[in-house]
Amino acid sequence: MRCLYTNLDTFHNKKTELLTRIHEVKPDIIGLTEVQSKVAAGLVNDIDLAIDGYTKYINLCSRGVALYIKDCLRSTEVTPSTSFDTSCWCSLPLKNKDSLLIGVIYRSPNATRDQTCQMNTLITEMVKRNHSHLMIMGDFNYPEINWNTQTSDAPDDSPPQNFLSNYKDCFLHQHVLSPTHYRGQQQANILDLILTNEPDMIDKLHYSEPIGRSHHLVLDWIFKGYGCVQKVKTKKYFVNRGDYDGMRLYLEEIDWISRLSSISVDSMWEVVSTEVLAATDTYVPSKTFTSAKSHDKRPEWMNARVLARIKKKKSAFTRFKETRAGKDYQEYVQARNMAKSEMRRAVRDYEKEIAKRAKSNPKAFYQYVNSKTKSHEKIPDLKGDDGNTITNNKDKAEVFNNFFSSVFTVEDLDHFPDLPAKARLSELTDITFTPSDVQKLLQNLNSNKSPGPDNIQPRILKECAEVLAIPLHILFTASLEQGRLPTAWKEAKIIPIFKKGARTVASNYRPISLTSVCCKTMEKLVRDSLLHHMINNEFLSDTQHGFVKGRSCTTQLLKIVDKISELLDEGYDSNIIFLDFSKAFDSVPHQRLLLKLQSYGVGGCVLEWIRSFLLSRRQQVEVGGAFSSWLDVLSGVPQGSVLGPVLFVCYINDMPDYIKSFIYLYADDAKLLYRVSDEEIAGGVSCLQSDLDTLTEWSRNWQLSFNVEKCKVMHIGKSNCSCQYTMQDVNGRPYSLHETKEEKDLGVWIDPTIKFSIHVAHAANKAQQVLGLVNRSFTYKDSDLLKQLYVALIRPHLEYGNAVWHPFLKKDIQLLERVQHRATKLIPTLRHMCYEDRLKALDLPSLAYRRLRGDAIETYKYLHRFYTLDSNVLLPLNQCTSLSTRGHCLKLMKRDCKSSVRANVLGFRIVNFWNNLPEHVVTSGSVNAFKNSLDKHCYHLRYCTALEDLWKI
């Protein structure tokens, strides 16, 4: 295994050169010290330190140290018990059951005696660990030690002498015998060391020129051991280079009708999938990659000029190292600076070209952006229930699959709850669709989505939609008529997606199912028919905003904030209960779900198809190219499927019928709201507590339990008596709900003041972090590129859901605007301008105007029925509009209010602005037409940042 080490003296400004050196050396193991600057210590973002293709182990105490192990090598983080700040450790299994313990250490030249003693103790501890091989690299800052004689002239009991003594007591071997630190014409010293527990462990130690302005050489060497390489072969299809004309001709020549007649749906699917995959292999170029070699290609920006400058830099340094002459040092500095300039120029030119082609090739642009701004980390070693560490990918996959299966519900088939009869206008027993309907669905597929377990690419289906619509229509029709899915459609590949918490714990991941794209296409037909049936029969609860056309997170939050502000304005305190289902999507009992669908009038072949969709499913988990064994799916609706979320919505649809409080739903996200009653103040049973008891009984009957430890209460109002609420856990024990002072709900932070200053602070901080990452990651920052990056990556953090939390405090307005102010100053050619002029030069509206515009768009959508909600609750129309001779026909009612919170909800703050808009704007025929008309009418406000100016028309 090849290893590389250097003292980098700040990572972010040398990353480009470091990647160049990594491409040149191709190391399996990388050790770095001083990865962050003295000024920015503790402020480095985790993504900043990522190197594609490597697993990183980082300790950012003081100046920081880092270890990088190639992804194809199994590695495990090791935590020492000795409290020495700047070290990082991991272990690698080797062949023949050997193991390698690797450490990187940084000892400051200003280290205290205690810190030096701790470092010596740490080394002793690691030597005593049960590993056959030990390798420690780092900057130890002991120029006083002569490593050729392993002696020092330093006084007895001094740090160098103590280190040497400990080194000999541990029977270590030090391999660096030439200077590693050159600062001008000062004396060169050996500061960087490589320590091992065997004399012949390393070979071909090479000293090369520093990276950037660092004074430390780069060391690379061969470790004489063989790591356990996890080679995974993956076949990649280059779908952008496919011969789709040839593929269409190939597929058109197949007599689909005769091939698919009088056979089972399983046989039909085998015929269709086999032919599509055969056509893919024939007409789409592909290549098989091995994970061990997949990251060895050079950076795309590296060109011949860069390579030539690097070569000159190497030659100049070699000459200086031999002569130590001042002239040669100056020539080296000049060559170093020219190489760095050439690299920057190459990166800048590449980024400029990427930006130019962003419109014609947005995929390439965002791939590059994501490579700079997102951390692509593999799943680390997991901690098993027994405390043991799980390192093998197949074993990890088994752990995940066992955990995901452990939450399945064992349904009580002996006792089913009673369901009240529901009057209905129609029943859903069959679905009619044509080949044209199937073709339209195929043409609307997202080509960038992943294929399912069958490996059929969405791009193939989209390109060949017209010809494949015929066989798929035959298959879909037969599947529906028989009420049976092809068996392959019921097999899911599960990808664990990290949520939050420790990455080493399996319960901190959620399962996402990758299923057949063709199956998802048919699911859309069933989903749309089911939703249409539920809405037409007025079965769907008005409180549900998730996965329903014309409703969203924003519409749900607008309703609850409007109700809270109404209660506050009327002088009432209120309480919110944030409910949390336990593994909601995975624990839905199948037979109870089918029972509910029957009660809603779903029957015939549609019900049988859904029954087949739910039952007899199985899943396996993939981790790093390794697969778990198959396990049966006993309950739940597949996360990642098209139909699953709607089935869940149907399952909990009756929950609001049993309670008196206001309830707000978004799929499995549920909140209860009610004003504080006189009974509560007097110590009696409140409406909320009664509803919680009812919901506990409902969850017990329908076997969909609440995670009571995550259910919380928020008390709103200055004189709120802060009552305690309880719920029963799965074992029937009462549990007092925790009080929360701030809660992130559907992406928006809510606090008892309902002024949203907390959300504004979170949004501004997140946007600022991303802005800093963009600033550090991109060399080329002209107006076009930065505007694209800002609009795509930063502004969404400042605007998500702003119709809900529209700030009205001056400090909050300024806090948000400062982020955009700071972003526009990053463009060198615009820094001299004032903020408003920069906005005009970039054609970038102020955030204050964007929020006002967003309010108007929300109002337009409500009044023109783009939302399937009653607009009179939030935005009541002026009933006298028809009698007025002035203004437009959609004027809003002006209502009185007492509190600033009430005055700032959408239905109050937008009234004057909306009512003063001309009729041709508010009656636009589409949302896009409204946006264009509004922007033209309000062009003079586009760059305004002062709130009072925004209300002028």
State the predicted function of each range:
Residues 222, 226-228, 252, 257-260, ...:
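Surface-exposed loop/turn segments and immediately adjacent short secondary-structure elements
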Residues 126-135, 526-544, 569, 645-675:
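Active-site palm subdomain of RNA-directed nucleic acid polymerases
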Residues 404, 430-638, 674, 787, ...:
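Conserved pre-catalytic core of RNA-dependent polymerases
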